[in-house]
Amino acid sequence: MVGRGASLCAVQPAVAECGPARETPPLEVSPRKRLPAGLDQDPCSSRPAPEGAGASAEQSHSAGGGGWCRHCHTKLVELKRQAWKLVSGPGTPLRDPCLSTLLLDKLPASGVQPACRPDTESRCDVCTTHLHQLTREALRLLQTPASHEDPNASRGGLAAPSSRDPPGPVGLMGRQPPVGPDRRKATAWPPGPSVQVSVAPAGLGGALSTVTIQAQQCLEGVWSLSRVNSFLPPTCLAEAAVAAVAVADTVRDCAPAAGPERMSKAWGRGAACTTALVTPAPGTSAGGSTGPSAAASFFIRAAQKLSLASKRKKHHPPPAPSTRGTSTYPTDFSGSLQLWPPPVPPCLLRAASKAKENPSSFGKVKVMLRIWPAQGVQRSAESTSFLKVDSRKKQVTLYDPAAGPPGCAGLRHAPTAPVPKMFAFDAIFPQDSEQAEVCSGTVADVLQSVVSGADGCIFSFGHMSLGKSYTMIGKDSSPQSLGIVPCAISWLFRLIDERKERLGTRFSIRVSAVEVCGHDQSLRDLLAEVASGSLQDTQSPGVYLREDPVCGTQLQNQNELRAPTAEKAAFYLDAALAARSTSRAGCGEEARRSSHMLFTLHVYQYRVEKCGQGGMSGGRSRLHLIDLGSCDAAVGRGGEASGGPLCLSLSALGSVILALVNGAKHVPYRDHRLTMLLRESLATTNCRTTMIAHISDSPAHHAETLSTVQLAARIHRLRRKKGKHASSSSGGESSCEEGRARRPPHLRPFHPRAVVLDPDRSAPGLSGDPDYSSSSEQSCDTVIYVGPGGMALSDRELTDNEGPPDFVPIIPALSRRRPSEGPRDADHFRCSTFAELQERLECIDGSEAFPGPQGGSDGAQASPARGGRKPSLPEATPSRKAVAPTVVTSCPRGSPGHDTHRSASDPSKTGTQSEQRVDGSRPEPPASDKTSGGGGRRPLPSPAPPPPRQPEAQGIPKEPGGEGTDSVLRTPPVGMSGQAALPPLLSDSAYLSPSARGRHLERGLLTTTVTLQQPVELNGEDELVFTVVEELPLGGLAGATRPSSLASMSSDCSLQALASGSRPVSIISSINDEFDAYTSQMSEGPGDPGEFPEGTAWAGGSPASSIGSWLSDVGVCLSESRGPTPQPPFSPNSAAGPGPPEFPTPGSSLEESKVRSSECGRPDNPGSARSLHPGEAVATTQTQPGREPWARSPHEVASAQTIHSSLPRKPRTTSTASRARPSRGPYSPGGLFEDPWLLRAEDCDTRQIASTGRAPSPTPGSPRLPETQMMLACAQRVVDGCEVASRMSRRPEAVARIPPLRRGATTLGVTTPAASCGDAPAEAVVHSGSLKTTSGSKKSVSPKGAFFPRPSGAGPPAPPVRKSSLEQSTALTPTQALGLTRAGAPSAFRGEEEARPSGRSDSSVPKATSSLKARAGKMDVPYRPSGHMSLERCEGLAHGSSKVRDVVGRPPRAVPRLGVPSASPPLGPAPACRNSPAKGVGATKPPAGGAKGRNLGPSTSRALGAPVKPLGPVAGKTAGGAVPGPRAAPRAVPGIGAKAGRGTIMGTKQAFRAAHSRVHELAASGSPSRGGLSWGSTDSDSGNDSGVNLAEERQPSSPALPSPYSKVTAPRRPQRYSSGHGSDNSSVLSGELPPAMGRTALFYHSGGSSGYESMIRDSEATGSASSAPDSMSESGTASLGARSRSLKSPKKRATGLQRRRLIPAPLPDAAALGRKPSLPGQWVDLPPPLAGSLKEPFEIKVYEIDDVERLQRHRLPLRENEAKPSQDAEKGPVCISSKLRLAERRQQRLQEVQAKRDHLCEELAETQGRLMVEPGRWLEQFEVDPELEPESAEYLVALEQATAALEQCVNLCKAHVMMVTCFDIGVAATTAVPGPQEVDV
């Protein structure tokens, strides 16, 4: 055994250390030196008993006349050891006579040891044994057949040789690894890698205790070269080796009795066997027992200590084969990994510390070359005659076999020998390389990448019989023979364990195995049998490859089985290998050649954020291990035609791989399934790919070798291009996509691009680098599993109780794009522009979550499955589904929604898709809105869409989501697409399905009129800008009922659905709209049922806690808006504003007026102006007048505002954003949470809108709206990633051209308002509101906020300017300014959120948040912070309150900023404000940049990031600054001067906050409570984190009463990286992600959260993940900040952000605002597209049916309750006023609901007439219990429920009519009618 060790040492000189004396040569060291003499002697004496063996030994030794002395035994051992060392290599035949001669010559001389000093030089003075005799014995032992015997024989027992050996002592039974030859086989590790010391305790006859010392590997040097095999440090390795050698030597040395024979036999057999220590039984030898036992115990202890010191679990010696459990399959890798897992290469663990590698390395494919030795022992000169390897240079030189090596005088040397060819690779494994060496050198870096969130791929390539399968699979006989796959499995789990301990990250590993085999390219799921538990044919019919235009090939429906342990994963490997065609009996060579196995390990990881609110970050990455067949039909190169047209030759396969790796546009044999499979695995630039090319060293295969080497060298030289698939999720997305099809849709993630967690990938993902977004991000889809209560579901709950669901997008905003899941797949990729495609790609995964999975109308069920939030069915589903539904809302993926989203560029598509989308994606949200009842003003048709959304959630209509159904639903029309089918489901399921819910929200948010704007160039992707004129009375619904966010989650869904349903959803114009819609979805739903349902309801319902929080935020915002300080200004502002004044007047209280302003203002001026606006305005107004007070009072006012705001400017978009946000909220870990954000955002937005709508409505309205629109677009885009950018970019133009755009396009409300002069203000208000809604919504959906803050990075800067601007605005119109501030801020928030481009919205919101934050300690941040207050909420509700007010003040500024045409001051000053604020913004932005570090200030940072926003807010705030009152003014001043505000309030925090400003602002945007922006609550992202807190706290009436997520949310900024399965992120997600999710956070989180590493990356990128202090604010802010950063760092956010920023148009406004500096280029770029998008708006009426009942039911209570808290939070003393307000709101709501009911009755009658149904039918079903007191809340709730039910009925009828006649119902815009108004398109 020692000999073996020696040989190993020979193989590995380093092992010499293991010699007896490290300092002296082994031969010179005597065993005594190694061990204390005592030990030596003791062992010797202890062996007397075994001496019986001694006799045998003696006999065997013919040389020794008598027994050899102990010294001679020692000498023998040493000689054997030296002989082994002298053996050249594993392949050297030991029996070679030459070797024997050489050894005889060398051993004696070097073997003379002082210890054995012979009498004479050659004899021992003790026993006179001749040294040569010992030498010959040593050689005999080396060469003895035993050495070649089956290791098991020796393993059977070394004592066996000697019958005399006592059985007990024969503890020699140490397991013997395969003998020399086996070990020598470079490819295998010795079966017994560890030195096993079997000790028979002195007292035990046969009892053996075994100690495994990982020394065999040390001794043998199996891992010597790389030392990767051992976890032990070199010193430990050396010690272990020494100990093992010492033990072995001692054993042999001490067993003279055993004698040479026994030892020789044992030794011979164990040439490579492990060391065995034989301890005689105590009785065996007198006095000898103590020595051996002591020695044995010493070594055992030493070994144990070494093992422990290595800090690695002690690897118990693999039991004898008999002890291993029998495997059901031919192979037993599972048992192997369990018994003797391969040692983890140190380089792997070291790499683990380096979380990531240089991103640049990702573009490169590592190519390694393995030289397979020719069979037989002919690895002689012949093999080296044409192949020379330089391992040091990693080069291989090929000579012409005829010429021979250069310096060789080969017989065939030709005079004109061809020039040798040299090739360099990343690594070369010569013929004698150990399998372990190959595995460690190949797998380590790939595993690191996978664990970090990127995809990884390792595949073998080469001709037949070159060990490809051996390399990949290996053998299960020993750790040294394990192949790459089992090693990767073992090490992956080891790495995961290490990461779990280090980072607390949770992982879930899933395994899938697919095979492409035969000439027919049959695709087989190798785990189908295991998965089904049946013996069904593995020809799993479910597995298929789908070509995805955007994401490339997607492998669908393969089984992914959860593997909690490496053994389980290995078990699946065994099963896959058994199921593989090559394992079948009679499998021929041809079958083997054409068998290609793809074994994939899907790594889902998520980390619960510190906040402990379920906030999680994480994602999915995949490790593809591909065992490629040789493909060639013949042993040679094989012709391509040999196997038929479908058969690829190896050269063809090489060309395919080269093309895929190179990102070539054209891939040969693209239709071949193997090509498709490889594309799915390799074509992602973010995929860490390693190719192991196999060549033969036989000259006979020179041609094959040369061709393989040439191909490998080409691949090695080329660097991965940022392939088209990068953004198309070739890898990640593909993985997502593949998951999409094969996983239940509900488990599908939204586009992972936004969720890359790995910092390296994060940047790319966020930055818009297609490459990065493709693999890592995509593969690392953010997976957030949200439980019913908004609680994050663990993978266990979602899956098999152990792992997270495949994945769910953590970013609802992105998810919103996923809404269209049905037709979406096809439509979704129908893009006229690449940007569009990219956008689709981004949401593909999420949107991919088909309602189907949810299948039922119950989004919840799908959502639960997907979101894992089943419990809160509506909420959970929405939450989970929110991802998809949100996407749906945003852009029904399957349906044109997504397309619309993208088809904006495509006019025809835009029209149709937009329409579809409107009806599919948007309509659904509007329907939801309608259903909410909050949007009573919205025509029933509007509600109809919600049902579609629900179907989407259900998966049936799933208008947006359900591609097929959705299509149909959408087809019915924009106006009423999903209403019919969805209504029922919508109410519940709609919420359930985030997508549905998003839609509902969107619907709720969107007004009837959907302007399908088709700014084609936003992001290069068509963006349908839909303006939903009709605005949901979100406030009304949301206000009362949804205070308790979590509790309401379920209802929230309903509310949301209702809210969404109540209002027709217009497909978000372009991405922005979509984004807004998405955001709005959250916000929208509440909007209609009184924006509150969606927003509030959402906040309350979706994320119950969130809702509370959100409401609080909203409340804060409302309070701010309505708040004492803000109220008056608001009222005046309202008055001042053309539209706002009008509404303000109707609104009893400031808040009411705010709501009015937002709701009415939005519709009134902008709303009216817009086709929908008149009606919408009417609806909104009607709702507003009645509903507004109601909405307002319940804090739904904010919601309403948000909705109105959203509708007017980009209400739809904004609304959508708002709604989307709620959707997101649900989507969030706690759908409730997200919802709350949405709600919050909406609330905030609503307020802001009210405020903006009112105050800024006049002057800032127009300009602001555009900006808002721009912002919104930007935000939306950001949320979507690509889409967001696109939307934004369009939005910017839209913003710039908002007035024209206002036509009802993107900014539904805004557009119209822009149209009219009054509308300009109104629009400003509406737009602002819209923006706010959007912004709020989006902000609320942290992404938006996050995104905006980024765009609104200027936002924070704006605050400083804002001071001046605000003051300016104030000077211009205190009231108006206040209105602007309030309305404007909301507007800005929304707008900003809606379109980053209209930075002001974001600024407003962010600023508001910032203000709130400023209150907390930052003025600039207030604006954003208002939304972000949630984030900063912990900082202080009071702060939030004042901040909110300030935000209210700020909003005007935001409005100006947003208010491209802000009020006159905003307009004139808007630019001025924008400029001034821009400066501030610019200044602030720097802080934002600086604040990045301080993610807490992300809001501010975001604001900074969104200078435009700040400018808007500045204008708004400036105007509102004075008006806002103490809060607004003071805050306005500090807040207004983004810098100043920051400097003032943030003075100390300025830098820090500035850095976080962006994040914060984003968060702020997300948190309506911060500012008077509804969306502030929307900031639920922050909301939960911060926004929710603020809004919720405020809403609750006491800042201290934030939603459950309020505080938690703040800390859970990691949510930003809640990407992967940070399914627990559900809660956090809702909290923080929403703001970021809205637009920014989502994208932001996306980018930051998609990879596991991306978590870290994202954190780094945003600076939020890292900031623990600001974690609360940072959570949302981080995302915001990250987003800002993203904006700042095009590289980081280039892909997502930039794309989203395609909304630069808003930036222009932003630029004007001063935000431009932050996101100048990017954002600026975006504007033109936005403008383009907005240029050609369509008004598409989308009717979304939602569960009005539910919406109303929940919204109302939320509104009332939330309104109260909101007021209280806002006013503080507002507690009383809050009650009054509540009553007022209730009254308003009652009026609105009644008006809506009347309107619905009329519509029902009309619809019945159309359907030829007897009039009056069903009406009795919707009557309210006459016994109820009309003034009571119960009556209102009952009325709302009845109205919701009626609305659903009407929607269903309308949908039916539309489906049958495709007619759009034009509803006369009656301001008195609370229901959403529809404008005929």
From Swiss-Prot:
Q: Check the record and name the PANTHER family matching this protein.
A: KINESIN-LIKE PROTEIN CG14535, KINESIN-LIKE PROTEIN KIF26A
Give the GO molecular function terms. Answer: ATP binding; microtubule binding
Function field: Atypical kinesin that plays a key role in enteric neuron development. Acts by repressing a cell growth signaling pathway in the enteric nervous system development, possibly via its interaction with GRB2 that prevents GRB2-binding to SHC, thereby attenating the GDNF-Ret signaling. Binds to microtubules but lacks microtubule-based motility due to the absence of ATPase activity. Plays a critical role in cerebral cortical development. It probably acts as a microtubule stabilizer that regulates neurite growth and radial migration of cortical excitatory neurons.
Q: Where is the Kinesin motor domain?
A: 364-718
Q: Where do Low complexity bias regions lie?
A: 1084-1095, 1328-1353, 1477-1489, 1524-1537, 1575-1587, 1664-1675
- Compositionally biased region (Basic residues): 742-751, 1685-1698
Q: Which family is annotated?
A: Belongs to the TRAFAC class myosin-kinesin ATPase superfamily. Kinesin family. KIF26 subfamily.
Q: Which residues form a coiled coil?
A: 1780-1812
- Compositional bias segments (type: Pro residues): 940-950
Where is this chain compositionally biased, Polar residues type? Answer: 905-915, 1366-1378, 1400-1412, 1616-1629
**Segment Disordered: which positions?**
20-66, 145-193, 309-330, 718-778, 794-827, 846-982, 1078-1104, 1118-1266, 1328-1425, 1442-1633, 1652-1698
Q: Which organism is it from?
A: Mus musculus
Q: What happens when the gene is disrupted?
A: Mice exhibit growth retardation, become emaciated, and die within 5 weeks of birth. The median and mean life span is 15 and 16 days. Macroscopic dissection reveal that mice suffered from megacolon, with dilation from the distal small intestine to the proximal colon and display enteric nerve hyperplasia. Severe occlusion are observed in the distal colon, because the colon motility is not coordinated. Defects are due to abnormal enteric nervous system (ENS) proliferation.
Disulfide pattern: none
Predominant location of this chain?
cytoplasm
Q: Does the keyword Lyase apply?
A: no
Can you say where in the cell this protein is located?
A: Cytoplasm, Cytoskeleton
Q: Give the highest taxon in the source lineage.
A: Eukaryota
| Gene3D superfamilies in the cross-refs | Kinesin motor domain
According to UniProt, the name of this protein is: Kinesin-like protein KIF26A
Which annotated residues bind ATP? Answer: 462-469
